[in-house]
């Protein structure tokens, strides 16, 4: 056996959505900001993403993270997230998992009953709070970047279907649509059709308009499509599944998607400041969300959302790359 690379990871999940935190084997990542570091990874470290996200070490739905030194003077650390298509700008379930793993493995030092962390992400500064009992994390909440409705009631015509979507930012840009527009339910049996529609809607919007953040050139494009449905659980407000990247299915309620959904509900006067919004996902897991404050992003009215969930560690791994392996860079099916 020959080994050219060794990577260590800690894996976790949030409502079924995986996060693989890469703890060893990562070279120096250059850049003064997280957006610059993300761009560096896209140009120089995409092989690492392919090796650890793709089969045979990962799968089509795998999500990953690298914890970096802080980019700003007052932050505790930075994060860079990756998936089956590339490098994302922010990931809410990833924040929940990173804080949980960091505390439960002793990576992060905590004192008192609650601990907050200031985190640099490519989308901006995120503040996370952990509620824990000894070494066990009970839940993690995070105050996300200002989230806003970019365009509402955008008309879409695809395959003789006419419907409208709202486009909102919650750390990334999402199109929000009701699943009933297609006669579908947010359930396993309709998932293939939902994936198909997610890809079509994303490509349609990006062919018709440029979606970009008014203050940050590096934040642009439709990241995912949120399909909204009536909840199954009596304690839930809405049910959803998010299709993002290259047809990837978010098993969790989607942290940045929940933030975008909070912005759309607030815009429609369907959610008030301080009111709890319970977002249910396709695995029946739930996030709690609320509007903490109202602010502005350029000319857009925005909200600062808070999202709460919990994560569980699933394993500690050591992956190797054999230079003789024709599939050493990985592959994707599905």
Curated annotation (Swiss-Prot):
<feature type="active site" description="Proton acceptor">
    <location>
        <position position="91"/>
    </location>
</feature>
<comment type="similarity">
    <text>Belongs to the proline racemase family.</text>
</comment>
<dbReference type="GO" id="GO:0050346">
    <property type="term" value="F:trans-L-3-hydroxyproline dehydratase activity"/>
</dbReference>
<dbReference type="InterPro" id="IPR008794">
    <property type="entry name" value="Pro_racemase_fam"/>
</dbReference>
<feature type="binding site">
    <location>
        <position position="250"/>
    </location>
    <ligand>
        <name>substrate</name>
    </ligand>
</feature>
<protein>
    <recommendedName>
        <fullName>Trans-3-hydroxy-L-proline dehydratase</fullName>
        <ecNumber>4.2.1.77</ecNumber>
    </recommendedName>
</protein>
<dbReference type="GO" id="GO:0047580">
    <property type="term" value="F:4-hydroxyproline epimerase activity"/>
</dbReference>
<keyword id="KW-0456">Lyase</keyword>
<comment type="function">
    <text>Catalyzes the dehydration of trans-3-hydroxy-L-proline (t3LHyp) to Delta(1)-pyrroline-2-carboxylate (Pyr2C). Is likely involved in a degradation pathway that converts t3LHyp to L-proline. Can also catalyze the epimerization of trans-4-hydroxy-L-proline (t4LHyp) to cis-4-hydroxy-D-proline (c4DHyp) in vitro. Displays no proline racemase activity.</text>
</comment>
<dbReference type="Pfam" id="PF05544">
    <property type="entry name" value="Pro_racemase"/>
</dbReference>
<feature type="binding site">
    <location>
        <begin position="255"/>
        <end position="256"/>
    </location>
    <ligand>
        <name>substrate</name>
    </ligand>
</feature>
<feature type="binding site">
    <location>
        <begin position="92"/>
        <end position="93"/>
    </location>
    <ligand>
        <name>substrate</name>
    </ligand>
</feature>
